Each structure stands twice: as structure tokens, then as C-alpha cells.
Amino acid sequence: MSRLSIAPILFAGLMVCGIGMGCSGKKSGPEQKPVYKVTGSITVDGNIPDPPIQIECHSIDSLEDLNRTFSSAQSKKDGTFALETYKEGDGIPAGDYSLTFSWRKFDLIRRQHSDIDLLKNRYADPLKSETKFTVDEKPTDLGEIQLKTK
């Protein structure tokens, strides 16, 4: 094959790759903020929770901000957790936060958590949360968070 006959094929291949990359469905968004590790552990009535606790992190300064980051975690089998914003266990941006907790069994048939919170929604309101903390530009250990069902 001559160089002239390869050029159109090469050009067409590059165009297909470029179109595929441009139409990949990935949304562009705001720049990712720097994050800092936040870890801790959870007990419920003095015991390691099973099923795991779902943890949501709420920025106190931006509860109404539509561009805020969303950070969360799920407790592990040993009761420990690491908050995440962009990928597993990466941390959260610096700031002031409150945590909310829910404890729901996972329904394998429906492939989702049940509607019943075993903590009776006691820890569901970020404005009433007793677990508040500040993340400076360094790792933060929240220690043991003790939740109660009664």
C-alpha cells in the first residue's frame, strides 16, 4: 500500500476515536477540590454494627449550596470508616461538617436498602447532628462514634 492510500484510513480511524471520546457520556464539572483523609469507627449500643452504617457528610457552611461536594462512607465489618468524595476513602475538602447516620438492612431481592432505619431516624437531620467536626488541611481521626437505638 502506498502512503496516499493509508492516509484516508488513518484519518478516518482518528476521527472515529475522537468522536467516541467526545461522546463518551462523561460530564465535565467543576474542578475537584483538595481532600484530606477523615477516618473513625462506629458502634451501636456498644457493638460493631451489622449490617453496615451508611454515613453522609454535610458541609455546615454550604447546606444550601447546590455546587457543594457530596461525601459519604459505609462502615466496614470492623466498624471503621473512611469518608470519600471522589473515590473510595479519599477524604473530604477542608471545612466544618456534620455527619448523619442510617442503619438499614440490604434487601437482596430489591437490590436496595430497606426503608426502615434501625436507628429510627434519630441521626438523620444534619442540622440536629451531634457529630460535628472541622477538617483542616491534614488527616482527621474522629475516633469512636457511639450511636444508640434507644
Model-derived segments and their meaning:
Residues 1-11:
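Bacterial N-terminal signal peptides that target proteins for export
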Residues 15:
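Flavin (primarily FAD) cofactor-binding/catalytic cores of flavoenzymes
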Residues 19-22:
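C-terminal motif of bacterial Sec signal peptides marking the signal peptidase cleavage site
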Residues 24-150:
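Beta-strand-dominated extracellular/periplasmic modules and repeats
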